[in-house]
């Protein structure tokens, strides 16, 4: 049974009790117990670019790249704690070479290259509506990235679990490439998760309205669970809690903190595949290239939300939307380059 998550820790640095929590987080980071994982396998197609999304320039009067903004956010924590954080960057087959070359070209934006580790996301075959493999060429099956739930298995496959164990990393902060305001390896978030004896934490924002297209952190059979926005029923959208507030109101922003020993446990399990209808480039029976304008088959993905369901606890950690949520999914309009620029400027970041 799914029910709303009734407890949420709200980030408010004016509260005196936050000082010990921040100390716990800073101490863990300073001792090298926290690593970060950047999910950066996407391309900038919807932004009008054929390059990796992270290389997109959002600057106005100067060059400001998405990757650069994220490294700057991470450097804020390095300066606070005096300790570099290992950053594991998940790329895809399509953008791996371009991503690595871009980081080298920009001298890793001043971050020590020994602390940045690239690995490629695993791929999954695509099929037509009858379940038959689509072909990319006469000798190659059409494939696509296997979803954001496959990140830890791909990291292990690259051998980086040995770096994690050797460095004594106990927590991994996983975050998406397209939110240029988020704090990474955030001491308060880390400290709050540890202090509340949770094995996972999720940064959440309060939804602007019941129809906002974000997944919602809930409880399902007393386990943490994320319900995607398209799965929310009208009853759930209109439900209120004991205070008369919207009940299903904690929107996730794909910024999670996982205890590494829990990740090892989950890695031994099989996450369910999600079938997603997509436009898939392929060849037809005569070997001619097909670039469909409408969906023509299925991709198969695993999702982080299914990892969350396998955990006993997940702290809902509310952040201030205007200070930590500037997603770049479109070129204009909602969640766009334009809207992100405005939020960055409001936070004093020169563009």
Task: Give short role names for the model-derived ranges.
Residues 47-48, 98, 129, 183, ...:
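Generic domain-boundary/flexible-linker signal
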Residues 36-38, 89, 118, 174, ...:
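Structural beta-sheet core signal
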Residues 37-49, 128, 233-234, 275-278:
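Active-site-adjacent bridging/hinge elements
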Residues 168-173, 181-185, 190-350:
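Catalytic core of tubulin tyrosine ligase-like
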Residues 54, 62-65, 126, 265, ...:
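A broad, structure-centric signal for solvent-exposed, well-ordered loop/edge residues
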Residues 108-109, 113-213:
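Conserved beta-loop-beta/alpha segment of the NTase-like Rossmann-fold superfamily
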Residues 1-116, 135-152, 160-161, 303-305, ...:
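N-terminal glycine-rich phosphate-binding loop and ensuing alpha1 helix
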Residues 39-43, 52, 60, 92-95, ...:
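An acidic- and aromatic-residue-enriched active-site/binding cleft used to recognize and process polar
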């Amino acid at each position: 049974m799914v029910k709303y998550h009734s407890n949420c820790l709200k980030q408010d640095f004016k509260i005196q009790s936050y000082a010990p929590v921040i100390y716990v987080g800073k101490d863990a980071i300073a001792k090298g117990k926290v690593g970060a994982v950047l999910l950066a396998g996407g391309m900038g197609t919807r932004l009008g670019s054929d390059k990796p999304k992270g290389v997109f320039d959002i600057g106005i009067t100067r060059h400001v790249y998405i990757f650069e903004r994220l490294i700057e956010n991470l450097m804020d924590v390095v300066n606070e704690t005096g300790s570099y954080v290992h950053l594991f960057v998940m790329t895809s087959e399509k953008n791996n070479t371009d991503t690595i070359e871009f980081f080298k070209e920009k001298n890793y934006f001043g971050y020590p290259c020994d602390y940045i580790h690239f690995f490629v996301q695993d791929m999954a075959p695509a099929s037509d509506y009858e379940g038959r493999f689509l072909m990319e060429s006469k000798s190659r099956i059409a494939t696509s990235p296997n979803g954001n739930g496959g990140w830890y298995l791909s990291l292990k496959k690259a051998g980086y679990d040995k770096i994690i164990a050797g460095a004594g990393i106990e927590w991994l902060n996983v975050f998406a490439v397209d939110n240029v305001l988020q704090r990474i390896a955030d001491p308060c978030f880390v400290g709050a998760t540890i202090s509340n004896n949770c094995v996972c934490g999720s940064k959440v924002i309060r939804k602007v309205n019941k129809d906002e297209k974000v997944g919602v952190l809930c409880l399902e059979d007393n386990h943490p669970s994320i319900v995607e926005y398209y799965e929310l029923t009208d009853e759930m959208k209109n439900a209120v809690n004991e205070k008369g507030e919207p009940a299903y109101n904690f929107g996730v922003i794909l910024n999670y903190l996982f205890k590494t020993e829990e990740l090892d446990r989950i890695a031994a399990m099989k996450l369910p595949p999600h079938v997603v209808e997509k436009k898939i480039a392929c060849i037809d029976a005569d070997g001619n290239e097909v670039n469909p304008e409408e969906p023509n088959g299925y991709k198969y993905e695993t999702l982080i939300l299914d990892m969350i369901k396998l955990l006993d606890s997940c702290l809902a950690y509310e952040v201030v939307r205007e200070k930590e949520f500037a997603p770049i999914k479109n070129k204009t309009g909602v969640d766009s380059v334009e809207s992100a620029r405005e939020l960055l400027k409001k936070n004093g970041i020169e563009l």
